[in-house]
Amino acid sequence: MRPLRPWALLLGALLGAAAAAARRYPHVAVLDGAAAYRLLWGRRGSALAFRLEVRTRGYVGFGLSAGGGMASADIVVGGVEGGRPYLQDYHTDENRVLKKDPQQDYHLEYAMENSTHTILAFSRELYTCDPNDKSITESTVRVIWAYHHKDLGEAGQNYHGSTRGTKSLRLLNPEKAEVSPASLSYFDLTNKDVPVPDKDTTYWCQMFKIPVQHEKHHVTKVEPLIQKDHENLVHHILLYQCSSNLNDSVLDYGHECYHPNMPDSFFTCETVIFAWAIGGEGFTYPPHVGLSIGTAADPQFVLMEVHYDNPTYTEGLIDNSGLRLFYTPVLRKYDAGVIEAGLWVSLFHNIPPGMPEFVSEGHCTLECLEEALGAERPSGIHVFAVLLHAHLAGRAIRMRHFRNGEEQKLLAYDEEFDFNFQEFQYLEEERTIMPGDNLITECHYSTTDRIRMTWGGLSTRNEMCLSYLLYYPRINLTRCASIPDIMEQLQFIGVKEIYRPVRTWPFIIKSPKQYKNLSFMDAMNKFKWSKSEGLSYNELVLKLPMNVRCSKTDNAEWSFQGMTAFPPEVERPYKTEPVICSSSSCLPCSLSLTLLFVVYVASSTIGNFGPVVQ
């Protein structure tokens, strides 16, 4: 047999290494609708490794942007031209002008090109201390992408035209242990031909019965089933456990939630057992945790609440979206639970207009956690994932954690919250919540584009400030929230007296004269809000006493429900660790520039790259 030439052996080894590298990227996202641009990435110590697989023989652009556009973005452009690789670190200014970075922080590992595709693999440190680079954190990031059929140098900076876009991702979401759906049974909870009204916000509720199991099983994965072309219509889905005293008669109908004619059975469904929001994908439970079904303590009847967002008032929409739950008789060690924490959704939560930033806080108080955990789990519960939830005015959300007056590391955060991308964040390390701890859901809003008050409520034009904590082992605590005192808020704008007893909602103001016979909502809108008044009001509401919500399943309550509490006094705020920057380090790589050159030249003779390019 004729021996292989050394360069052929080398080429085979390199291509094999490239294919193996593709399998080492645990995260994958298709960035465009035509599946022409595929992003793979993975954490490598203090850096992030990327692999781009794009259907073009020209340049490929990739970037990180605060707002999803080209202005003030961190960009890298690369490709293979004439058998030689190129990869350049760029940035854009506020006018979207592309400029080469003096400090090159993206490091090429390898590049390949065939008759249809270009593959680029490169890395970058999370923190470079380059003012032209965007730090990579656990927050949402708007990934921007573009490509062209020509390389960058052929005719200057070729405009990418329509082959561009943006997608929100969480690049540092920890790797999760996937389960093979083929090995699991599943059942679907989906709406059946729901007529979505031609109004901006609809909450539709439908009862379901969990398929009867004769022994305990664990749900290990939940996937959204969103009807095609309804990805922007279905804003979120909540699944509630209902009273075990119901019977099959409740299954015959769906109805608008929170409606005066809503069926009485809906009021028995208070315990959230799963939450999905727009932009999110399926959720896989950790290997040691599952959602229990099949026992007397588990949900038999569930209520699925679907939030439809129809701002264009489109008529004739029919929806069949829902959830798919995968389950197994092979039990995990722990049962999962969900706690809804934050601000109770209410008109008592309000935000003045014209504010560049306004902060609201929802408290899961030490009194509630002391009572509930002290009775059910004195050694604490373990949080493994968090979903942070707000609406259109939301800009950032933090879940703060306090113990004995000392602030702990943030439980979860998103400094670049995207209303259109809300999913459970897997925590890098599980966090223990102990009796007597405090949790604060801190939401940052911007209302610079609004001329009237923004109110807490169900519409996406209203606001929420909530966190959904996935934890184990399951205890009898479903909601841990707060409502700020409304009367002190009204005193800020000069309200002196309201009509009592309260017979209408919103209640009516009696004095002073300028607000007489106005509802408190009308009075707040009538007040002349300035930025300075808004700042003073914000300082006030963060110090107000609050009404505590501390709920069990089946509409039961812990004894502290309805009592008054005060925000915690923080003796020792958490000090973040200093950022260590690196711009010169590169991921360990066995491919030298000389070896890479062989790949660049030889790859042009390869018909395709096998399974790594689709």
From Swiss-Prot:
Cu cation A binds at H235, H236, H307. Residues 23-592 are lumenal. Its EC number is 1.14.17.-. It is found in: Endoplasmic reticulum membrane. SMART domains: DoH. Residues 1-22 form the signal peptide. It holds the Pfam family DOMON. Cu cation B binds at H389, H391, M464. One of its GO terms (biological process) is norepinephrine biosynthetic process. CDD domains: DOMON_DOH. The chain crosses the membrane at residues 593-613. Glycans are attached at N114, N247, N476, N517. GO terms for molecular function: copper ion binding; dopamine beta-monooxygenase activity. Its cofactor is Cu(2+). Binds 2 copper ions per subunit. The keyword Oxidoreductase applies. Residues 35-148 form the DOMON domain. Keywords: Copper, Disulfide bond, Endoplasmic reticulum, Glycoprotein, Membrane, Metal-binding, Monooxygenase, Oxidoreductase, Signal, Transmembrane, Transmembrane helix. The keyword Heme does not apply. Disulfide bonds join C205-C257, C242-C269, C364-C480, C368-C550, C443-C465. InterPro entries: Cu2_ascorb_mOase-like_C, Cu2_ascorb_mOase_N, Cu2_ascorb_mOase_N_sf, Cu2_monoox_C, DBH-like, DOH_DOMON, DOMON_domain, PHM/PNGase_F_dom_sf. Belongs to the copper type II ascorbate-dependent monooxygenase family. This is DBH-like monooxygenase protein 1.
